[in-house]
């Protein structure tokens, strides 16, 4: 079966910085597991001001690899930032990886 890549554009709710920081360890743990499995291409937060961490975040972007969209949806159901109301929504789009090769 060919694995599929997806871009996740995650938007934060306003006023969730403290909660985001509190829940971050669980979020990072799940991303580390994906990375250990070789299914995480890239992940990171989008700061409102890169020079001021207290300004908060617009959200996060991830590129992940799953066997099916359904498998990704199941994984997302357990995403701590979604479950705890940090993300207002996650936009999922298929992605055709061209570079880097391999």
Question: Where are the model-predicted features located?
Answer:
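Conserved, structured core segments of small domains
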Residues: 1-102
């Amino acid at each position: 079966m060919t694995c599929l890549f997806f871009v996740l554009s995650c938007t934060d709710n306003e006023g969730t910085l403290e909660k985001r920081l509190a829940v971050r360890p669980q979020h990072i743990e799940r991303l580390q597991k994906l990375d250990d499995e070789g299914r995480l291409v890239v992940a990171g937060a989008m700061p409102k001001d890169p020079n001021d961490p207290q300004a908060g975040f617009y959200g996060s972007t991830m590129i992940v690899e799953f066997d099916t969209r359904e498998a990704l949806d199941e994984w997302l159901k357990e995403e701590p930032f979604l479950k705890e109301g940090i993300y207002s929504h996650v936009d999922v789009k298929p992605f055709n990886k061209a570079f880097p090769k391999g």
